[in-house]
């Protein structure tokens, strides 16, 4: 395998609406991001994954795109975008664009024309049927919406304002590749591909994910756009197994650099239930089993994985699986140390590096997220008590990740001089960037050190992974390459745990505790975590 820059990269996800507001309108924007590049350079990241900034009516916070080659006015202008790319490049940071090509907005010119004129070429860019089948939208209700003008139904697996594209149409595919090349020519560093495993769907056969044409489409895309360029491409693939991940990310297959797989995230939900039926407690044995499978079965020669706990759709890791009260700092560091030394490309979501937490939502009028609001409406109709609904939204709702970035202890956490589009977490006076940078023992410096360890130990790209047999609540593994061995240990609980590991410590690389020189028969305090090099 030829080693690429992204094997050793660490990517930072920016959710633009909530990162930094430069003009006081309460919404984060591109100049705001540019103004914080020095902070991100200090963290040490290699690339920024930018959630969508394209022109959009914002029905789903920008994942409903009206024009792929224009910037939404709330985020700024194309000049602002060009400046962000250029300023990031000066700091050796690449910009990864979010590519949403499973669907568009219903306000995209293609869909407007498709509705106006049933004989237009654009009509076939979307999926129309005379009668709907029983496919459901991921955002609740039917996946089919009736269009009165033409008397047909169009398919939308997300909101009805997000009609699905018909990838069987070759002309549409060429239009998408032209748009991708427009961004590549601007100097971006790659693409994160939203729900890309859905583009091969066959709705009449109820095939939604991993349809038979998915991989041929991706190979065609690769060859028409980024294939001969040194770009990072990552596909959002909810249903992927290690075997499926190889189809996407084996360099010989000429598709993508890596995948986002979500098997570990599935442990947040009760099996066979909608996401709102969340698991009260993390099944650590299952977590170890899942990571062990991905670390050992997706080898460096035949594929590549992403490493993440958080993104814009998920609750804060320190709140759902950590302890965001008594052990907030320690549990946040434990999850970071555990993840960042595995094989794969780590992703940090904005605010994760300072230990931002879920928001204490109390009423529905505090909620902005379309998915949460649709769930609440349907649940209320079914007679589910509002207390139960709010509990689910507090724990698992997407707005938890979307509250504004907490920069300092000034009004609105320094995010905006205006009224923020979504309320700032009331804990911002204690949890903010200014506080983190001033404290040498903060979560921020743990992340900074982890980024540095990866840069200085490129052998970790290829190193073997060995899961160790430990107490149930302890996750421990060894990364090994030739004579070099790193031992990583994390106690994922609020209780003390016993640990016995054979071997002698050569040096301590990182810790959130006082790492013991002697590994045999030690007692781990709650949320203890460390990485040591073994002799």
Curated annotation (Swiss-Prot):
PANTHER family linked to this entry: ALPHA-AMYLASE FAMILY MEMBER, NEUTRAL AND BASIC AMINO ACID TRANSPORT PROTEIN RBAT
Active-site residues, Swiss-Prot/TrEMBL: 194, 236
Listed Pfam families: Alpha-amylase, Malt_amylase_C
A cellular-component GO term for this protein: cytoplasm
Highest taxon of source: Bacteria
Main location, first listed in the record: cytoplasm
Protein name: Glucan 1,6-alpha-glucosidase
Gene3D superfamilies linked to this entry: Glycosidases, Golgi alpha-mannosidase II, Oligo-1,6-glucosidase, Domain 2
Compartment annotation: Cytoplasm
Protein keywords: Cytoplasm, Glycosidase, Hydrolase
InterPro entries reported for this sequence: Glyco_hydro_13_cat_dom, Glyco_hydro_b, Glycoside_hydrolase_SF, Malt_amylase-like_C, O16G_dom_2
Broad EC category: hydrolase
Catalysed reactions, semicolon-separated: Hydrolysis of (1->6)-alpha-D-glucosidic linkages in (1->6)-alpha-D-glucans and derived oligosaccharides
Entry's family note: Belongs to the glycosyl hydrolase 13 family.
Any one Gene Ontology molecular-function term assigned to this protein's record: alpha-amylase activity
EC number: 3.2.1.70
Site feature (Transition state stabilizer) residues: 313
Transmembrane regions: none
UniProt key word Cytoplasm: yes
Function statement: The physiological substrates may be short isomaltosaccharides.
